[in-house]
Amino acid sequence: MAFLLTTRRLVCSSQKNLHLFTPGSRYISQAAAKVDFEFDYDGPLMKTEVPGPRSQELMKQLNTIQNAEAVHFFCNYEESRGNYLVDVDGNRMLDLYSQISSVPIGYNHPALAKLVQQPQNASTFINRPALGILPPENFVDKLRESLMSVAPKGMCQLITMACGSCSNENAFKTIFMWYRSKERGQRGFSKEELETCMVNQSPGCPDYSILSFMGAFHGRTMGCLATTHSKAIHKIDIPSFDWPIAPFPRLKYPLEEFVTDNQQEEARCLEEVEDLIVKYRKKKRTVAGIIVEPIQSEGGDNHASDDFFRKLRDIARKHGCAFLVDEVQTGGGCTGKFWAHEHWGLDDPADVMSFSKKMMTGGFFHKEEFRPSAPYRIFNTWLGDPSKNLLLAEVINIIKREDLLNNVAHAGKTLLTGLLDLQAQYPQFVSRVRGRGTFCSFDTPDEAIRNKLILIARNKGVVLGGCGDKSIRFRPTLVFRDHHAHLFLNIFSGILADFK
């Protein structure tokens, strides 16, 4: 097992990184091969093309049971560790995608391995309770040690779920209940409401809506899919709701050269948000809430300014709409702050905030006023998993103890600077470099070139992800450090130099 392997410590020299850029040269860094993290490998090791023969055979077998066309390769998770993912053919790759941004502190972290092995934790991993009715004795303590210790400003209430989609789906329900409760006032449910809700009719099922943005991704369940607008294949053939969809800013880069253009673009989008709220109120499909990602991820790593989000928050407040921030992909530290919305600098950033991925469990925080008025209104069998809360508490301890948020900010600056250097050297392949922390991306000329670059990088020992129509995104772990950035930049510079 990887976590039983003898740990290693190789200390980085203090020599400054050396960047050499001449016409036609490749990115060179003397720091690229340095290792300073005790359970990491020292670099990629490739034995076959990926997917290799064993992966291909397993893909054929899986395809007899389900559609396996999305599978990239099969993994050996016992041998994977740190920032490196090992496949079943023995290929060791620097993983900058980290299970679609869901691995917080690397593979097989020794502290988590130790936690799993402790006898007092065995029952937590063996028994999965129905938390809504039969929680374990230590459930409250573990919530306080884990999720409540990083609760966003103004949100003292928490409901745990299993994934990002069910987190947003139930957040929508919470918003609808809150909005109807405001309209209803102190009186209870009427007989008509109780009867009509059973046949999907108003007033029991009011025609409320959630406003979302083009390019957004909020999940694949029915309500979430109505607010997801990133790829047609996610939505085709699925019935949906008549809910408003606003344009999300499409910023021009470099930002400092297009300040006025980008301000006008954001103003246009905000104006459309207000127009849609008014329009849907007149259509009797009142906008009960607005959902937005701090950075549109699946839709192409689309950014907006902090000022845009502050003004959007004001619009929600002005029109009495709940403001739901989807931190499923941006949360957990990858932007250099624990929650990406902290960059906005607001004392009242949101009414509801959803999370998952790096948080190891799903769920949403919310203000006291959004608390469901009765049991079973927001409910399912498991309501998350106590074992994930146990692991998350240790992850948060490690983030604090090892100052990983500052590490993300520093490593992210190294990565972003290197990408900007590559953009200057290979503008025909790399454009619109952007990012916050290690949450970085760039555009390629088209989808075909993007996909080819990702495949070549994988065969060179680097796992990358795509997003949007033609973007490459970076989603490394929080233990991704400067030397990992330099290692990637050296490899990718060589790929670009040879690309045809």
From Swiss-Prot:
GO biological processes: cerebellum development; copulation; exploration behavior; gamma-aminobutyric acid biosynthetic process; gamma-aminobutyric acid catabolic process; gamma-aminobutyric acid metabolic process; locomotory behavior; negative regulation of blood pressure
Cofactor note: Binds 1 [2Fe-2S] cluster per homodimer.
Subcellular location: Mitochondrion matrix
GO CC annotation terms, alphabetical: 4-aminobutyrate transaminase complex; mitochondrial matrix; mitochondrion
Spans traversing the lipid bilayer: none
Residues involved in pyridoxal 5'-phosphate binding: G164, S165, T381
Residues that coordinate or bind [2Fe-2S] cluster: C163, C166
UniProt modified residues of type N6-(pyridoxal phosphate)lysine: K357
Keyword terms: Acetylation, Aminotransferase, Disulfide bond, Iron, Iron-sulfur, Metal-binding, Mitochondrion, Neurotransmitter degradation, Pyridoxal phosphate, Transferase, Transit peptide
EC number per UniProt: 2.6.1.19, 2.6.1.22
Molecular function terms from GO: (S)-3-amino-2-methylpropionate transaminase activity; 4-aminobutyrate:2-oxoglutarate transaminase activity; identical protein binding; iron-sulfur cluster binding; metal ion binding; protein homodimerization activity; pyridoxal phosphate binding; succinate-semialdehyde dehydrogenase binding
Gene3D superfamilies from the UniProt entry: Aspartate Aminotransferase, domain 1, Type I PLP-dependent aspartate aminotransferase-like (Major domain)
Transit peptide as recorded in UniProt: 1-27
Cofactor field: pyridoxal 5'-phosphate; [2Fe-2S] cluster
Pfam families: Aminotran_3 (PF00202)
Domain of life: Eukaryota
Broad class of where this protein is predominantly found: mitochondrion
Catalysed transformations (reactions): 4-aminobutanoate + 2-oxoglutarate = succinate semialdehyde + L-glutamate; (S)-3-amino-2-methylpropanoate + 2-oxoglutarate = 2-methyl-3-oxopropanoate + L-glutamate
Protein's job: Catalyzes the conversion of gamma-aminobutyrate and L-beta-aminoisobutyrate to succinate semialdehyde and methylmalonate semialdehyde, respectively. Can also convert delta-aminovalerate and beta-alanine.
Record note on quaternary structure: Homodimer; disulfide-linked.
The family this protein is said to belong to: Belongs to the class-III pyridoxal-phosphate-dependent aminotransferase family.
Protein name: 4-aminobutyrate aminotransferase, mitochondrial
Lineage per the UniProt record: Eukaryota, Metazoa, Chordata, Craniata, Vertebrata
